[in-house]
């Protein structure tokens, strides 16, 4: 995969699946695909995207600025504050040393990526802020390599947290993880589905999940009904709602 293709993949790995991620992917493919775009407008779009966390906005915003450093008229607080606000004085010092001593000698994406892999996330965040504030001191390949290494670490942390919740010893946590996953799927189907049957099924699923939450896990058949709804979502055709109607 190309340099820009790798960067898009790492940036998207940070975000939750859903309609917002699909919209972000389309934007990233346009920005990194060579189409001309206005940097300020792109940064405003990222800044106002509600489905992104502050760190995600900062990383995506920085990546866009790395593409067009000459068009960057002013530094953005929504980028600098999350990058500089994490970690301790010691980790920030490590990030500064990494940026000033090691990354300045790098020439390629993979070289920067491999060096960045050996440092903790808070140090990499500060390193990226130094690169963002001094864009002329580093090549685009080095800046994107450092950013992608950080994205991999962030995505790994998110995956472990999600897996921990899914395997929780508390039944209520596992149940709500299933419900949240099902609701996200239903909302995405409703928002992006073009056929009436798909949208109708999505609305039914959202309604049924709401009923399940009202029933609560203490109900005798609550867990069984929840599993049946999850089974409906796993159907490849997404068109079998008979199982849900049998209970609700």
From Swiss-Prot:
Membrane-spanning segments: none
Subcellular location, record wording: Virion membrane; Host nucleus
Cellular component GO terms held in the UniProt record: host cell nucleus; membrane; virion membrane
Record carries keyword RNA-binding: yes
Any GO BP annotation: viral budding from plasma membrane
Effect of residue 221 to S: The virus is lethal in mice
Stretch list, region Membrane-binding: 1-164
SMART domains tied to this protein: Flu_M1_C (SM00759)
A Pfam family per the record: Flu_M1_C
Motif (Nuclear localization signal): 101-105
MF-aspect GO terms: RNA binding; structural constituent of virion
Membrane topology: Peripheral membrane protein
Family classification: Belongs to the influenza viruses Matrix protein M1 family.
Assembly and oligomerization: Homodimer and homomultimer. Interacts with NEP. Binds ribonucleocapsid by both interacting with genomic RNA and NP protein. May interact with HA and NA. Cannot bind NP without genomic RNA.
Protein name stated in the entry: Matrix protein 1
Source organism of this protein record: Influenza B virus (strain B/Memphis/12/1997)
Gene of this entry: M
């Amino acid at each position: 995969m190309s340099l820009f293709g790798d960067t898009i993949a790492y940036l998207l790995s940070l975000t939750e699946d859903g309609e917002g991620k699909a919209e972000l992917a389309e934007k990233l493919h346009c920005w990194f695909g060579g189409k001309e775009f206005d940097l300020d407008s792109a940064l405003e779009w990222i800044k106002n995207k509600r489905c992104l966390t502050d760190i995600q906005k900062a990383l995506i915003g920085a990546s866009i600025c790395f593409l067009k450093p000459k068009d960057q008229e002013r530094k953005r607080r929504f980028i600098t504050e999350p990058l500089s606000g994490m970690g301790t004085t010691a980790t920030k010092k490590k990030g500064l040393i990494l940026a000033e001593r090691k990354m300045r000698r790098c020439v390629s994406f993979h070289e920067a990526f491999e060096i960045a892999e050996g440092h903790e996330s808070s140090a990499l965040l500060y390193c990226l802020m130094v690169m963002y504030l001094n864009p002329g001191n580093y090549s685009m390949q080095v800046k994107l390599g450092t950013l992608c290494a950080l994205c991999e670490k962030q995505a790994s942390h998110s995956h472990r947290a999600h897996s921990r919740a899914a395997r929780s010893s508390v039944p209520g946590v596992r149940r709500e993880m299933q419900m949240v996953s099902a609701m996200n799927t239903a909302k995405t189907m409703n928002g992006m589905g073009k056929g009436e049957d798909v949208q109708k099924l999505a609305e039914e699923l959202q309604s049924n999940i709401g009923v399940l939450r009202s029933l609560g896990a203490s109900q005798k058949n609550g867990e069984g009904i929840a599993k049946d709804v999850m089974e409906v979502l796993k159907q490849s055709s997404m068109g079998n709602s008979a199982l849900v109607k049998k209970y609700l």
